[in-house]
Regions:
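Helix-centric, low-specificity signal for extended rod-like, repetitive segments
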Residues: 91, 159-162
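Residues in flexible loops and secondary-structure boundaries
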Residues: 16, 62, 94, 106, ...
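Outer-membrane beta-barrel signature, preferentially recognizing the C-terminal barrel domain
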Residues: 123-153, 159, 166-225, 235-245
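Extracellular/periplasmic, surface-exposed regions of secreted and cell-surface proteins
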Residues: 229-231
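A short local loop/turn or secondary-structure capping micro-motif enriched for an aromatic residue
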Residues: 11-13, 57-59, 101-102, 169-171, ...
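Face-selective signature of the C-terminal outer-membrane beta-barrel domain
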Residues: 1-147, 151-153, 210, 217-220
Length: 245
């Protein structure tokens, strides 16, 4: 993806790039994925599935502005799923999966911002804090998910489903290493390299009634996150000249 706009800057002393001076942003994201699944049927009542998948991403950037850092990200996961169906009335399934992930984020220094802040009289500590659009991060993750479900169909008129599970999400590059103004929201966003995977629990149930062409369904859903990743305002002003303040 590329975004082109006539060169502009918040610093009068920043020269336009010699090559492609009007290329504001460019992202070259390459994704490679692979997966393998094997199904085993133990009997007429039991079915098992073993699976593996992996993915590698490489993001390269260019342009005179900055939005996302360069990074490479690799994930791999192994899963096992079992289904037990003794008859046409009852079906029980359960599965577990473990994932491992690694992300390496490249640092990005804004030398023109550093020069601007020095000219404005900010001390070395403040300059060092603000001049990095992204920090170097090397992070390993490991987490698991599981699910357990039941389907009960006592008759053609009634069906009951119940599911419970645990899920997770690995933090993205911006959540780990961002340090600058997000122009879509006009706020200074700062990542946290100590973040762990986001974890959540889900439970849902449903009851479906069919009677003489009438169908009635009730399906409550509950979700709870034990390590939810969210924006936490600090109440502090950003010193960046393009912070929209």
């Amino acid at each position: 993806r590329e975004e082109w706009s006539a060169f502009h800057t918040h610093y009068g002393f920043q020269p336009a790039p010699e090559k492609d001076p009007d290329k504001e942003l460019a992202f070259d994201l390459n994704t490679y994925s692979a997966s393998v699944k094997a199904r085993f049927i133990g009997s007429s009542s039991w079915e098992h599935t073993l699976g593996w998948d992996g993915q590698h991403q490489q993001n390269d950037i260019s342009g005179y502005s900055f939005l996302l850092p360069e990074y490479h990200r690799s994930t791999t996961g192994l899963l096992w799923l079992t289904t037990y169906k003794p008859n046409n009335i009852l079906s029980v399934s359960g599965g577990v999966r473990y994932d491992y992930g690694y992300i390496g984020i490249s640092p990005h220094e804004d030398v023109y911002l550093a020069d601007y802040l020095r000219r404005q009289g900010y001390d070395d500590e403040q300059v060092e804090s603000y001049k990095w659009n992204s920090h170097a991060v090397r992070k390993h993750f490991g987490d698991y998910s599981f699910s357990l479900g039941l389907v009960w169909t006592p008759s053609v008129q009634h069906m009951v489903k119940v599911n419970i599970g645990r899920s997770f999400r690995l933090p993205g590059a911006n959540e780990l290493a961002a340090n600058g103004v997000h122009h879509g929201t006009f706020r200074h966003e700062q990542g946290d390299a100590s973040l762990k995977s986001e974890q959540g629990w889900q439970m849902d149930a449903s009851y479906n009634l069919r009677y003489h062409g009438l169908s009635v369904s009730v399906s409550p859903f509950v979700s709870w996150f034990s390590n939810y990743i969210f924006l936490r305002p600090t109440g502090e002003w950003s010193v960046l000249p393009h912070a929209g303040q």
